[in-house]
């Protein structure tokens, strides 16, 4: 039996992750440095992350990192499906400039993501699109855009590499937020970046 009998888009993406890790982390670090001014991030005490499909799962998976690196008295970190966030979130009570609303979407195309970001803008929250498409509706709606710069791949579906990119971007943001707010020691961002590459290479 030949190994190539088991070749498929998902297995190809799985096997590509160790090689993807370093350029993905570098790309996300570049995007993060250009995303939100540090004086804006320093005010953040509440974070709401939303997405659809694998982006929603990335939002959920990233919450422990935010709690670990940026958790402090009075802080709150939550996630929600984009449709639920758009319908049921009381944006007027989030905290205005002290609240960061992140819409995660590689394509930046889902209407619900843009709707959430638009409502965040309306109520004075800090809105951020974490995406790989700077011309997307989400990027154009959000006050700030965090481009993760995921390298191209012959077959982008299913979205495993996009999920990896979204989660990497969120992890790095959590570490940077922790550094800026004094919840984590200097070097937390650098340490997170190195750990992401090292751990993925060990797969």
Feature map (PLM): residue ranges:
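An N-terminal, well-structured beta->alpha segment
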Residues: 1-45
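Alpha-helical structural motif
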Residues: 6, 10, 17, 166-169, ...
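Cofactor-pocket helix-loop regions in the catalytic cores of large enzyme subunits
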Residues: 22-36, 188-203
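Glycine-rich phosphate-binding loops that contact phosphosugars or nucleotide phosphates
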Residues: 42-198
């Amino acid at each position: 039996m030949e190994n190539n009998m088991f070749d498929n888009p998902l297995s190809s993406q799985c096997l590509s992750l160790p090689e993807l890790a370093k350029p993905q982390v570098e790309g996300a670090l570049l995007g993060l440095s250009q995303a939100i001014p540090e004086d804006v991030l320093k005010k953040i005490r509440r974070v709401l992350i939303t997405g659809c499909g694998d982006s929603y799962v990335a939002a959920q998976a990233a919450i422990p990192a935010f709690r670990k690196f940026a958790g402090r008295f009075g802080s709150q970190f939550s996630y929600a499906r984009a449709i639920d966030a758009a319908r049921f979130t009381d944006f007027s009570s989030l905290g205005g400039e002290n609240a960061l609303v992140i819409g995660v979407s590689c394509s930046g195309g889902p209407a619900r993501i843009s709707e959430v970001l638009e409502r965040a803008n309306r109520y004075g929250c800090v809105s951020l699109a974490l995406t790989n498409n700077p011309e997307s509706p989400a990027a154009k709606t959000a006050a700030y855009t965090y481009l993760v710069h995921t390298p191209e791949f012959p077959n982008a579906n299913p979205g495993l590499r996009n999920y990896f990119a979204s989660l990497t971007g969120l992890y790095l943001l959590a570490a940077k937020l922790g550094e800026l707010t004094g919840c984590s020691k200097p070097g937390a961002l650098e340490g997170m970046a190195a750990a992401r590459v090292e751990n993925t290479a060990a797969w």
